[in-house]
């Protein structure tokens, strides 16, 4: 399915996203003229491939390929064992869509419940492994070509991590990640030993530091183009599997980055509705993209909702494509591509 935004729709008033039913047709919604700069004249939304793409999308330009982690599934059914997930690679062909199933392959890496991922400065994948009851939660580095896995960090102060969820690499090489206790709540991790924190890891010194502890369930995170601001989603409204508590956090928090290693006091940036935010990214203009149950919501630098890529089931997304102007979106059942007129902030993929 593909939709091109026609000029006639740009001047029409559009209802807010929570007015749309869950089965709303994929497309674009303009709430503010600023979103027209994001869309350009030829924006379109296309199905790339039907597959179990869940989290961690990473585009590698040198391969023209998208890596992602799969929906966790228990072998033989929920009653037969702990859930498992793997890293998959989707070989692309520019914008020749949709992709064929033959272009999907599994990365031969021994990873345990992988979730969020990003591209390291050395071209390897930096992976959030949530762990299991018998395998530790950790941040690892994976060579997708060989499947070789290297542990970067698997504990704080001698205590086990919860279930690392999402990760970003700053230009100085430091690794920032969230560590909510979803693994315990979903039954595949032991009882937590630490809080639901946001961490900064310095591979050079091996030092792991807590940089934020004021979250219910810290989830996605992304830096502004100048890396002076860190945005973190809090999906505390989804505290238990399948639950939604409207009185719990479902918002994006912004922090000033101090001395490249500390965070100032958090401030509310935006509240997402319907649902709760998971994935988050920032474009070259400083606009913030956050997931909601209705799709990808796009906010101005001031925190105003300016538009939406309507795609129910959205989990996470990343900028990529040969020119960097494609937002690849995972929905648990498919990978979609939104062709836009902007690129990601400080895009280093590939």
Name these PLM-found stretches.
Residues 1-350:
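Sequence-structural signature of mature extracellular/luminal beta-sheet repeat domains
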């Amino acid at each position: 399915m593909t939709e091109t935004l026609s000029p006639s729709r740009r001047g029409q008033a559009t209802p807010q996203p929570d007015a749309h039913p869950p089965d709303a047709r994929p497309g674009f919604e303009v709430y503010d003229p600023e979103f027209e700069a994001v869309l350009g004249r030829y924006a379109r939304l296309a199905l790339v491939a039907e597959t179990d793409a869940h989290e961690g999308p990473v585009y590698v330009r040198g391969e023209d390929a998208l890596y992602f982690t799969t929906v966790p599934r228990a072998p033989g059914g929920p009653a037969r064992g702990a859930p498992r997930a793997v890293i998959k690679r989707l070989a692309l062909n520019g914008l020749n869509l949709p992709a064929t199933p033959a272009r999907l392959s599994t990365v031969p890496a021994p990873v345990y419940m992988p979730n969020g991922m990003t591209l390291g400065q050395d071209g390897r994948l930096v992976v959030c492994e949530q762990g299991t009851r018998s395998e530790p939660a950790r941040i690892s580095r994976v060579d997708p070509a060989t499947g070789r896995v290297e542990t970067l960090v698997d504990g704080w102060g001698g205590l086990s991590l919860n279930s690392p969820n999402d990760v970003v690499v700053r230009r100085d090489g430091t690794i920032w990640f969230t560590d909510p206790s979803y693994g315990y709540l979903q039954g595949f991790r032991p009882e937590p030993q630490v809080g639901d924190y946001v961490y900064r890891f310095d591979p050079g010194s091996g030092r792991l530091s807590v940089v934020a502890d004021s979250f219910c369930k810290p989830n996605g995170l992304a830096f502004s183009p100048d890396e002076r601001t860190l945005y973190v989603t809090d999906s505390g409204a989804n505290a238990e599997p399948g639950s939604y508590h409207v009185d719990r956090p479902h918002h994006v928090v912004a922090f000033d980055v101090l001395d490249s290693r500390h965070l100032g006091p958090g401030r509310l940036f935006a509240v997402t509705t319907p649902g709760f935010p998971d994935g988050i990214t920032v474009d070259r203009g400083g606009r913030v993209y956050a997931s909601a149950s209705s799709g990808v919501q796009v906010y101005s630098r001031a925190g105003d909702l300016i538009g939406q890529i309507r795609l129910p089931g959205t989990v996470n997304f990343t900028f990529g494509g040969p020119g960097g102007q494609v937002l690849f979106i995972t929905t648990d059942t498919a990978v979609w591509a939104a062709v836009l007129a902007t690129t990601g902030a400080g895009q280093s993929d590939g």
